[in-house]
From Swiss-Prot:
PANTHER family: HEAT-SHOCK PROTEIN 20 FAMILY MEMBER. The lineage of its organism: Eukaryota, Viridiplantae, Streptophyta, Embryophyta, Tracheophyta. Residues 36-152 form the sHSP domain. It comes from Pisum sativum (Garden pea). GO terms for cellular component: cytoplasm. It is found in: Cytoplasm. This is 17.1 kDa class II heat shock protein. InterPro entries: A-crystallin/Hsp20_dom, HSP20-like_chaperone, Small_HSP.
């Protein structure tokens, strides 16, 4: 049988298709990766109340501090957002598997009335963002007003 026969040409074509398909599947994001990318928007957070402050701890693994924003909107809503980005691909380098999550995340928290929006600090360490919102001092109790009664 000749190597240029239609049968061998067909077999080579099928083998080339299989190689291309296998290579594409190795480089394609997995279903888990696509599904879990949505999880970046619902990142876990804990909120604690201390005697003088509220502390918000938000998991932000792999998010660089320069890609994190902490804002107050509408005078009482703490908005925390960030984005985990994929590294730029270098020429000649390709992913064989993509499982790590990338994407944007955002969490909003309604602040209590006694939150001091002028005294907020944030620090990112070991993949956890800690935002501290100090409390306003309690209002002083109102003293009764005494009205002087005049003689007519």
């Amino acid at each position: 049988m000749d190597l240029d026969s239609p049968l061998f040409n067909t077999l080579h074509h099928i083998m080339d298709l299989t190689d291309d398909t296998t290579e594409k599947n190795l480089n394609a994001p997995t279903r888990t990766y696509v599904r879990d990318a949505k999880a970046m928007a619902a990142t876990p957070a804990d909120v604690k109340e201390h005697p003088n402050s509220y502390v918000f701890m938000v998991d932000m693994p792999g998010v660089k501090s320069g890609d994190i924003k902490v804002q107050v909107e509408d005078e009482n809503v703490l908005l925390i957002s960030g984005e985990r980005k994929r590294e730029e691909e270098k020429e000649g380098v390709k992913y064989l598997k993509m499982e790590r999550r990338i994407g944007k995340l955002m969490r909003k928290f309604v602040l209590p009335e006694n939150a001091n929006i002028e005294a907020i600090s944030a620090i990112s360490q070991d993949g956890v963002l800690t935002v501290t919102v100090n409390k306003l001092p309690p209002p002083e109790p109102k003293k009764p007003k005494t009205i002087q009664v005049k003689v007519a």
